[in-house]
Amino acid sequence: METIVNQRKKTMYQQLADIDENISWGAIAKEYFDKSASWFYHKMDGIDGNRKPTEFNLEERIQLKGALCDLADRIRRAAETIET
């Protein structure tokens, strides 16, 4: 007998839960995607405005990864300018 395990894919919010409250997702949407905040939030939630499943496609996931890496670099550079 074969057992089929139905695993739900984590939403992007779930994957990025550690930084969720520290990031302005609306600013990421505008600056890196040239999209509205609502478009971005729907992708993050995994559900579109019509309550249908949605997610970032591969290109968008790569773009989001790059955006977060760019932001991390910018934060690091800003931190290094603080005189101690």
Regions found by a protein language model. Name each.
Residues 36-56:
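Recognition helix of helix-turn-helix/homeodomain-like DNA-binding domains
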Residues 34, 46, 50, 70, ...:
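Amphipathic alpha-helical interaction surfaces
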Residues 22, 34-37:
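Alpha-helix boundary/capping and short turn/kink residues
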Residues 5-6, 48, 75-84:
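Short, charged recognition helix plus adjacent turn
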Residues 4-20:
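Short, amphipathic alpha-helical "recognition" segments used to contact nucleic acids or chromatin
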Residues 24-32:
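Short alpha-helical "recognition helix" segments of helix-turn-helix
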Residues 2-5, 69:
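Cell-surface/extracellular proteins and modules involved
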Residues 55-75:
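DNA major-groove recognition helix of helix-turn-helix/homeodomain DNA-binding modules
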